[in-house]
Design a protein with these regions (language model features):
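Aromatic- and glycine-enriched glycan-recognition loops and surfaces
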Residues: 231-318, 345-346, 382-389
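Conserved, mostly hydrophobic/aromatic
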Residues: 62, 184, 225, 247, ...
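Short Pro-Gly-centered flexible turn/kink motifs
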Residues: 179-197
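Short acidic, Pro/Gly- and aromatic-enriched capping/linker segments at domain boundaries
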Residues: 162-182
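Short, well-ordered coil/turn segments that N-cap beta-strands
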Residues: 219-223, 251-253, 295-301, 359-361, ...
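Glycine-rich, aromatic-flanked loop segments that form ligand/cofactor-binding clefts
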Residues: 6, 10-28, 133-152, 194-215, ...
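Active-site neighborhood of glycoside hydrolase catalytic domains
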Residues: 284-286, 296, 316-400
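Polysaccharide-binding surfaces and accessory modules of carbohydrate-active proteins
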Residues: 1-160, 175
Length: 400
């Protein structure tokens, strides 16, 4: 069903891509090179680059480049897999807080789809789909590594020839997506991992594990103590200091303070986004004493922050409304505009000050809220790229 020979079949670009824009619909004959299938016109260059490892895991990287001398509008761009017809089952997985990893097989009659519309790319759906051929008793697992809001759809289709095929279309969500590519500009589509399996129960997950061990070597994590796991947001010197002493006796290496240390009133949640110590509740301005005690006991001090979110009435939003995106009415939240470099630099400065003041050696960066509408109309492609740049800059400033 799926080997490297898959990419040597099919001559129509629709077998590998789906998209449209000011240039019309993506279609026409493809060409091939070493590890690449591509389609070049006067307007664009589409490339599907692929590799296959020793365990049968295929990595697919697709891109589209504007090769014309004028801007090109792009309303949709996705990757495609086309398989022979037959009777199929499709596996998808739901993912949400307290209801993670709820997966099931569905009989494919017309179409089965899954997607993630939020800036949190695993909200509502896991970016994963599996196919099972009832005739051949084998399947294909397909993982999407999102760089934007995304969608995956498996459907019976009669558009690529006279016989019905199984077509999987996946990539950046088409909702609220209208991107203009400047001459020479490249849009990188989400990376895809896929492999064949014969065990329907675990989908030969050892193949994925082997891939991850090679490309993302396991790190030994330190022993970390989180104050939330003891008493949630009840933070006071008389409550936390004994925990510091006991944690040190237990061999804890990092001791960090979770949510509730910041704000300007009794309800800290109303001040999310204002990352300065609360002088009314919690430690009442004396958190540095906790940090010093942690270090005296031979541990490293950490702090909880949530830089991407802010309450509408926070001082940060009032001071810099141009740095935030207003969420929908239901969420009643504002979101730092990571697509705005000036906003990113400002937040990096805020975190720099916290690290210097408290000697922070560990940050828990929580990501608790969902935003579903991208004002830039890129399905959060610019937002995610900005967030990645933000994290990279933070690590470069503070490699320790």
């Amino acid at each position: 069903m799926f080997t490297q020979k898959y990419f040597e079949r099919g001559t129509d670009a629709k077998c590998f891509f789906r998209g449209h824009g000011t240039f019309g619909e993506i279609q026409g004959e493809t060409e091939r090179g070493e590890g690449v299938v591509f389609r070049r016109t006067d307007d664009y260059l589409l490339q599907c680059k692929y590799t296959m490892d020793a365990y049968g895991v295929c990595t697919r990287d697709d891109s589209i480049q504007n090769v014309s001398d004028r801007p090109l509008d792009l309303q949709e761009i996705k990757s495609r897999f086309v398989f022979e017809g037959g009777e199929y089952q499709v596996y998808t997985q739901y993912c949400c807080w307290q209801t993670e990893s709820r997966g099931a097989w569905h009989k494919l009659t017309t179409a089965v789809s899954v997607g993630g519309a939020s800036i949190r790319t695993n909200q509502n759906g896991a970016p994963f789909i599996a196919l099972w051929s009832e005739q051949e008793q084998r399947g294909v697992a397909i993982h999407l590594l999102p760089n934007a809001a995304w969608e995956i759809k498996a459907e019976r289709a009669h558009t690529l020839g006279k016989s019905t095929k199984l077509v999987v279309t996946l990539g950046i969500s088409s909702y609220n997506f209208n991107v203009t590519l400047s001459p020479g500009e490249v849009l990188q589509m989400p990376k895809i991992l896929c492999y064949e399996f014969k065990n329907k129960l675990d989908m030969d997950c050892y193949k994925l594990h082997n891939y991850l061990h090679i490309h993302y070597p396991r790190r030994e994590m330190p022993i970390i103590y989180d104050t939330w796991m003891c008493c949630f947001d009840h933070l006071a010197l008389e409550n936390i200091m004994p925990q510091v002493d006991l944690a040190a006796e237990m061999g804890v290496e990092y001791f960090f303070i979770d949510a509730g240390w910041f704000g300007k009133g009794k309800i800290w949640s109303a001040s999310v986004g204002d990352w300065s110590e609360n002088t009314v509740t919690a430690f009442q301005g004396r958190m540095i004493e906790v940090a010093d005690r942690v270090r005296e006991k031979g541990m490293k001090f950490g702090l909880w922050i949530e830089p991407e979110r802010a309450a509408p009435d926070s001082d940060s939003v009032k001071m810099h409304p141009e740095f935030y995106i207003r969420g929908d009415v239901e969420s009643d939240q504002c979101f730092l505009d990571f697509a705005n470099q000036e906003a990113r630099e400002w937040m990096l400065g805020v975190i720099d000050e916290l690290i210097e003041r408290y000697g922070i050696a560990y940050i828990k960066d929580d990501f608790n809220a969902n935003l579903y509408f991208d004002p830039y109309h890129t399905a959060f492609l610019q937002y995610q790229a900005g967030h990645k740049a933000f994290m990279k800059a933070l690590r470069e400033r503070h490699p320790e």
